[in-house]
């Protein structure tokens, strides 16, 4: 069905919490070499994960809109994942379910939409050009298709620079959750010009 002019609720009561929780410190000093065996091993350990889920705080900030929400991200198999955005009261604002060749999105009115491109659909429905295809790798601490990136002193991603479709994304990682094995990102910030996406992961469950 046609995609309407759909917007998420501006969840202002959550603003201070998210902006504080998602503050990211730019890495300082030289990091480890991307050619190091430790980095290759870390990437392999992450790619070996069959299933994982994380939840936390989400913020999208641009000149046009500000969106704050809680998020839940779950991957159950290759190219099978679920993204849920909720407001402070726990009500669902957006639910996206993706599998190979089919993506379904349900908005906060219960309206269902289908597509074969999750990134394009979520952009049209929300007005937020989230680089979802790349973010699926970045949220795991993997560079995806990016070749311009830096590592921290623990052989993990600290920064990514990636250009695609007229967008120039810079991704900065503010820390990692070492309670999981392998260690997973704890918070990150994506910027492209005047727009920012902030994610703070409260916890990870990996298998």
UniProtKB/Swiss-Prot annotation:
Taken from the UniProt record, the cysteine pairs bridged by disulfide bonds within this chain are: none
Task: List lipidated residues, S-diacylglycerol cysteine.
Answer: 22
Q: Which GO terms describe its biological process?
A: lipoprotein localization to outer membrane; protein transport
Sorted alphabetically, which InterPro entries does this protein's record hold?
Answer: LolA/LolB/LppX, OM_lipoprot_LolB
One Gene Ontology CC term in the entry = cell outer membrane
Pfam families, sorted: LolB
The protein's UniProt keywords, in alphabetical order, are: Cell outer membrane, Chaperone, Lipoprotein, Membrane, Palmitate, Protein transport, Signal, Transport
Its subcellular locations are: Cell outer membrane
Q: Which residues form the signal peptide?
A: 1-21
UniProt topology in membrane:
Lipid-anchor
Q: Which domain of life is it from?
A: Bacteria
Lipid attachment, kind N-palmitoyl cysteine: 22
Protein purpose: Plays a critical role in the incorporation of lipoproteins in the outer membrane after they are released by the LolA protein.
The record describes its quaternary structure and partners as: Monomer.
Tell me its family: Belongs to the LolB family.
Please state what the protein is called: Outer-membrane lipoprotein LolB
Native source species:
Escherichia coli O127:H6 (strain E2348/69 / EPEC)
**What is the gene name?**
lolB
């Amino acid at each position: 069905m046609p995609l309407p002019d759909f917007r998420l609720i501006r969840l202002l009561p959550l603003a201070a919490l998210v902006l504080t929780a998602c503050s990211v410190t730019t890495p300082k000093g030289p990091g480890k070499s991307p050619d190091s065996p430790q980095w290759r091993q870390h990437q392999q350990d992450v790619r070996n994960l069959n299933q994982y889920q994380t939840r936390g705080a989400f913020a999208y900030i641009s000149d046009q809109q500000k969106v704050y929400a809680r998020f839940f991200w779950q991957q159950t198999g290759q190219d099978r994942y679920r993204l849920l955005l909720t407001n402070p009261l726990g009500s669902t604002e957006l639910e996206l379910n993706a599998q190979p060749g089919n993506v379904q999105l349900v908005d906060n009115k219960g309206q269902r939409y289908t597509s074969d491109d999750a990134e394009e659909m979520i952009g049209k429905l929300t007005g937020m050009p989230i680089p979802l295809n790349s973010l699926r790798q970045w949220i795991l601490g993997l560079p995806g298709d990016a070749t311009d990136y830096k590592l921290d002193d623990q052989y993990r991603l600290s920064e990514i620079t990636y250009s695609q479709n007229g967008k120039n994304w810079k991704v900065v990682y503010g820390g990692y959750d070492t309670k999981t094995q392998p260690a997973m990102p704890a918070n990150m910030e994506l910027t492209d010009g005047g727009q920012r996406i902030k994610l703070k992961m409260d916890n990870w469950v990996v298998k």
